[in-house]
């Protein structure tokens, strides 16, 4: 392959293009096929399940080859993108008629998982994001781009945990990183990793590139000028997007700095355990999104999921959302608005394809339909008394000129592709109408010619036809071919017929084909001009699509509130979560029986609830519903409860269930402890914390000790709003020792060999766990259950003899060792502080400074 002289001119052209795109598949256009060669062919054959063949030779060996037909390429690209592959599309750009040697070819675009915009390649109701991460020592910069909408954000996560949580939130399908990135373990869980050279992250280049993109002199207007690492990441990401699209990106019009303090933070464990958009098995069934998302537009569905994964903390913004939902319900507007929204479709992504000049004819008809709905929606909302609701559509501009353009230019039901012709409407362009008239007149002329030739020859089977190879022809059956006149020139012999050409037909063929070619060329030119006329209004159109998506989300949430009997939560400036008769939004939809609603009372004087009760009794459901109701409130949604008053929340943590992380070599217990450590380091008094069964996977005393210490730390030091479920009944004595803690339990009724779970939360500790009854329900053999009951009786008798002493010992340990440890920690901190206050660095010799460091080390 290195010696190009050994290859044909066409293969030399291929190898030169492949050298420019060495790491991705190259789809090389040859006639009606895209061909792949060498290793690309082998890889594509395996991934796409297509035939692997051979063509010519290289160094004496046949060249592997595989191909896909051009008209079916979108399906193959979709499969490759889903597998995380990138593909360079190489088209014939030269004219075969005038080319000497191989037709000129160019890579016209590069399809990557994070930069696709074609409708067939995208998940309709999910964001498709590409991200870039940059590291400088222990600091990070992150840039995120949705090329299908133009949303471009940067942030600077404060530490590794924050970066990991943010990456898990956005779940990029493609992730670029600098070649000197140190913490690769953070990135390994993500697919589509792309290593980029250091120079692509240079700050000066990034700022210059961004200013060119936004047509600005500096970036102060975006409020991002101080986010240096984020800008470095943004520069690399924007350049990558430009390189892959091979065109301008006019729909990327701004850059926003994501402020983490404005949102409730959710780590990966919390997103997983709360099953927001993905259940624990990896599917989408029985998730919060499956219940809440009945949006009628794909862009509304995507916006709802962004609200779900990034709840906002500002009560003022939340009340605007809530007031709009209330107004929609009070005025009974849902049924009036949703039919118009349904006609709008995915306006957001259509506009992105317009910006990239890749919009297809049917995209433009859908955009036309969307613009037709706006006046109706504006009229409906203008009649309302709610100022919040009437203000919603104010950002939407006037698009009558653009609507008129699309109504005049595009036919009602155009073909899929402009290359098929017949897209531009009659009357839009006089020259096009003339060429079409000449072309369309062929049918009438050919019918007249066919009738005339039948009469002059006396051949009743004579027909005039056309194919792409031979053009127009006169066909006569073999039985009457002997009657063909002398001036008929034979063009093709078939089994049952002969085909001829005559000078008159040939002249007309040249005329018609010229007219068709001219019409198609002009039509393509007019189609491109439509983009030129729409692009100056792109920013206003994008703002309209975002506003309409928000209206879809709010209308959807109003419908959900009415259908599912949700109420508007209240927000308080005081710390606490007060829920009356709360319900789990997902579980209540899948239960065949009525859901048992339960209250939650958490506030500074009652911030730790020790929850006990039987397995399957509802402890996990109770905790999850508390978190989901809180999260829904901070989305701006109504909530499944009789009433809810919720104070400021900065983070939601969950430590619910665990399994081995075999890929990382971590046991269940290690996973559990890692998640617990994250909570103990990150939680604050404004955090909502759910802990379920901490301390499993190790010895009883180890587990009990850890559970006790974690509960005490959360109650004393962090004072987080905590729901702490446990099977360690010894922990039920904690409320006697810890101010702000209380016991609650879920009960069950056992009768003979059956058990009925009550699912109602009651004050106080549970009396027993009903573990054997649950085991029987699970199908454990009765002989095993009987033996277990015997052993249980023996163990209970034995343990009862020293149960009181054991609890007393725990109480004593709590009062002495725990307090002593905290006191020692405080004492050591005080000593270090006092020593540092007395120290004057300017008066120390190097030897004295070293001595001081040793003393400080001892104190720590």
Curated annotation (Swiss-Prot):
**UniProt-annotated binding residues for ATP:** 613-620
Note the PROSITE patterns from the entry: DNA_MISMATCH_REPAIR_2
Keyword presence, DNA repair? yes
What SUPFAM superfamilies does the entry give? Answer: DNA repair protein MutS, domain I (SSF55271), DNA repair protein MutS, domain II (SSF53150), DNA repair protein MutS, domain III (SSF48334), P-loop containing nucleoside triphosphate hydrolases (SSF52540)
A Gene Ontology term for the protein's cellular component: cytosol
GO molecular function terms attached to this record: ATP binding; ATP-dependent DNA damage sensor activity; damaged DNA binding; mismatched DNA binding
**Biological process, per Gene Ontology:** mismatch repair
Q: Which branch of life, at top level?
A: Bacteria
Q: Which CDD domains match?
A: ABC_MutS1 (cd03284)
UniProt keyword list: ATP-binding, DNA damage, DNA repair, DNA-binding, Nucleotide-binding
The record's family statement is: Belongs to the DNA mismatch repair MutS family.
- Entry function: This protein is involved in the repair of mismatches in DNA. It is possible that it carries out the mismatch recognition step. This protein has a weak ATPase activity.
Identify the PANTHER family for this entry.
DNA MISMATCH REPAIR PROTEIN MSH1, MITOCHONDRIAL (PTHR11361:SF34), DNA MISMATCH REPAIR PROTEIN MUTS FAMILY MEMBER (PTHR11361)
The entry's protein name is: DNA mismatch repair protein MutS
Taxonomy of the source species? Bacteria, Pseudomonadati, Pseudomonadota, Gammaproteobacteria, Pasteurellales
Gene name per UniProt: mutS
